[in-house]
Amino acid sequence: MNPVDQPPPPPLTQQPEEQAKEDHDDGDERLFRDPLTTYEYLDDCRDDEEFCHQFLRAYLTPIRNRQEAVRAGLLCRTPEDLAAAGGQKRKTPAPKHPKHAMVYIRRSCLVHSACATAHGKYDIRGLTLESDLAVWAALRGVPLPPDPQHFRWLNAGAFRRLVHEAQYLPEISRAAKRIALAVATGQYVVCTLLDYKTFGTRTHYLRQLCSMTEELYLRLDGTLCLFLEPEERELIGRCLPAALCRGLPVKYRTHRAAVFFHATFMARAEAALKDLYAAFCECGDGRDDGGNHNGNYGGGDHSSLSPSAVASHHSRLEHAELRLERNRHLGAFHLPAIRHLTAGDVARVQDSVSRDLGFADWSQTLVDDYFLLPAGWACANPRRGYAMYLASNAVLALRIIRLLRASIRHEYTACIRMLSGDVQRLIRLFKGEAALLRKGLAQNPVQRRELSRFRKHVHDLKRIRFTEDTFVETFCDFLELVQRIPDYRSVSLRIKRELLCLHVFKLRRGCRAPPTPEAVRVQRLLWHSLRHGDAPQDRTRLPQFSSALSDAELSNHANRCRRKAPLELGPAVVAAPGPSVRYRAHIQKFERLHVRRFRPHEVGGHAT
């Protein structure tokens, strides 16, 4: 066939999600550019700060009657209006009036906008609206349920890089940028490490792992009544915490889950599990090729092993050298020798642990005692299989507990070191400013006051010393100190709230974020915060967090913490993360109706 005669290729079809995103973006663009977009304002709460009233006066014009609607272009003049004005009726029928969008603005959303930004919620000032929302979502989105395929732990270095590379307002000084970076780092520590009672934090996950491991050992202790042979009961007893703590400076009855952090406890638990495999396993997979605990246990002859067990020797769980993603600076680690796993189970466990230490998989379960190992081992009788399953889960949980504790300690010390460096950097900046004024001889009273102010800032900053034991108290003192620095104090929260409300309610576009999954997540979280409200994490609320990351706190010994549910946004927010929009061709009531109040520099009414 001649290429000219070939039929044209069929048009490329788009996926439903991509098509929905494009339709949503086109709809938003029409709302921003249509000068006849109307707004209905709903009074559903009090306005104590007068922000809502001033926002309406600045950016919206009320429509009180039909004449004002005609002047605004929302309605055409009717034949009755023409007759009353002395005109003649139109003989031809009037053209069909197009439909225009009506956006619903709730006063509660305007009030809640105070804590829907990093400036209002966390006192991180000076960022542009787009960067502000990105930093705010990184901290506020910690309690969200993780995506098992894409979730990774956020470390302090990556978060500081996000804040450091963000876009700042042009009038922000170098000192204000450094203060914003330090405040963001302190809020990161509180949101990810010191908030024990919120889903998504590492410390909450560590407490739940400790509670789960205690439950596993309690159930393993309960299996002793199922065995009559003294040798079998002794093997199970060696796997229990009371025997593993023998000779150690910590006791399980006194310190409870804090003993799980001890290295010797972990090594003894792994050795006891090997002995349990050697005695209870009947399929041959329990024989380890790296040790000899029971005569011929772990020898090089695999003739007695099943074919599946021989194949599994090439992909043992403990053979792979793993590194925690986004925390590779913690070094390589190996998982314990867990048996009776298929090649798929081994790959799944290794991937889950190296990705996020099993957090995403754990968060998807509804049963607290379930972890990463598959249930239903058929290598022995049900009694022995159940005992091996409980002991294996406990040993795997112990290894992850120690890895998680190490990552928490590393994050905490790294953040304290970074904050101390920020304070020293601020001291050098203010000393430099004071030196410039001093070299200029401070010739007038204004310069002399500035010189005195810089010297006072240096004196106050020298008293800020971040330590592990007094982090929260020192951070509160730092927040109080920066409120006395004009470069940081003068950044307006009202302007940031106005920009946010203008963008959310389709009055003026404040940022042009690409339609990525992360942008959709930020939009949903933002609309949830505007609908339900939030509280600022300021100096009045921070003292409720504890600075002590002791073993008793991390293991939940002093204050037992139940498993918390993640932050659910709700189906309404997920389906429509934005204000309600309706299209109407006929306007019957003018109550609560508004249109844009365009500024003189906005030509043609295109608020872009």
From Swiss-Prot:
Report residue spans for region: Disordered.
1-33
Q: Name one GO cellular component term.
A: host cell nucleolus
Gene name in the database record: UL27
Q: Which UniProt keywords apply?
A: G0/G1 host cell cycle checkpoint dysregulation by virus, Host nucleus, Host-virus interaction, Modulation of host cell cycle by virus
Task: Give the protein's recorded name.
Answer: Protein UL27
* Purpose of the protein: Promotes a cell cycle arrest in G0/G1 by inducing the proteasomal degradation of host histone acetyltransferase KAT5/Tip60.
Domain of life assignment: Viruses
Organism, scientific name: Human cytomegalovirus (strain Merlin)
Main location as per UniProt: host cell
The beginning of the lineage is: Viruses, Duplodnaviria, Heunggongvirae, Peploviricota, Herviviricetes
UniProt biased composition (Basic and acidic residues)? 18-33
| Assembly | Interacts with host KAT5, PSME3 and EP400.
Matching entries from InterPro entries are given as: UL27-like_protein_herpesevirus
Bias type Pro residues, positions: 1-13
Q: Does the keyword Signal apply?
A: no
Which family is annotated?
Answer: Belongs to the herpesviridae U4 family.
Can the keyword Glycoprotein be found in this entry's annotation?
Answer: no
Q: Which GO terms describe its biological process?
A: symbiont-mediated perturbation of host cell cycle G0/G1 transition checkpoint; symbiont-mediated perturbation of host cell cycle progression
